[in-house]
Amino acid sequence: MKKINWWNSIFTNKDFKELSKAYFNKNISQGAVTYKFEKLISKFLDIKYTIAVSNGSSALLMSLICLGINKNHEVIIPNRSWIAPANACNILGAKVVIADTQEDLPILNVEKIINKITKKTKAIIPVHLNGRSSDMLLLKKIAKKNDIYIIEDAAQAFGSKNKFGFLGTQSDLGCFSLSVAKIISSGQGGFIVTNTKKYADKLRLIRTHGVAQVENIEKWKNIGFNFRITDLQSALAIQQLYKFNKNKKHLLKIYKIYRDEISNPNFIHIPVDTNSGEIPVYNEFLVKNRKKAIKILLQNNIITRPFYPDILSADYLFKNNKRNYKVSKFSKYGLYLPSGTNQSIANVMKCVSIINSI
């Protein structure tokens, strides 16, 4: 029996044709196709500047470098996140300060960051997990009052909105991912968006070892590294962008089925505010006996994925700081059910049927 993967992306013959076109036109490294992709993203998100980069993690690291974050600074991030924001801070020597998440949603509880702010606090990174918006209005008020930068981690939130517009466009810098399990994907890749020209100019230098171009370099003037994306990846990303509305519609359909059809009381749905424009890329549940559920589903050829650990579980980040750490319910019970831009409705209905029979 064919296995149902936890994620299934859609790649078509048209994607392959565009990749082939870029290849035969010798658009291999970063070039014209990438610049076209950047313009398309800026138009889509209604933002002035887009800088395409190697991946979403690089986007976060570059953003911190751009804003001058260093070992003398502290950066506030939520306990529930992929590890990338914390690792990016750690690489630069900045102290990671963990803020609580909301009680019933795995996103930053903005009201609880006030007592985390010190004279060393330089930035806050709200993480818009699974397309969910943090309270950006309150966060911006707090940041402005305390002269703190905001970097939105919108890796899982491309196309998601709140009442103020697209997530990732409501701060100093917004970081996005194009990895496989996203609403649009180029395999790997990412981008940074901003409305501030000086940040865009600096990010373009950081992307290529601190230089604007690699020919006729007279002097090394700025810090940077190789954070470039390729035209091959950008060609694929452009075609994926054209599928955005179709992908969004499909993901919303899957979300509605899981939300409405699962009746097992041991599977507690974690909601996404689709009425406000949030897009649920994944389908998340709190499962009382997660190990048992994973085992039963796997016996039925259904692959699920447990939530990743809390950031507070990363001992290497806090080795010099005492902390009282209690595992969150999201880390302990969270489970991703099969989804994806190419996940069939038949697969989803099978998952529902098995879950309701447990």
Task: Label the predicted regions.
Residues 1-27, 32, 338:
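N-terminal "arm"/small-domain region of PLP-dependent enzymes with the aminotransferase-like
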Residues 27-74, 88-92, 98-100:
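Phosphate-binding glycine-rich loop
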Residues 34-39, 47-51, 111, 123-127, ...:
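PLP-dependent aminotransferase class I/II
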Residues 71, 77, 98, 150-152, ...:
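Hydrophobic residues in well-ordered beta-strands that form the structural core
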Residues 80-86:
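Conserved coil-to-alpha-helix start sites within the AMP-binding
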Residues 92, 145-146, 300:
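Helix C-cap/helix->beta junction micro-motif
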Residues 95-105, 305:
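Short beta-strand->loop structural element characteristic of the AMP-binding/adenylate-forming
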Residues 104-186, 191-193, 197-198:
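Active-site phosphate-binding strand-loop segment of PLP-dependent enzymes
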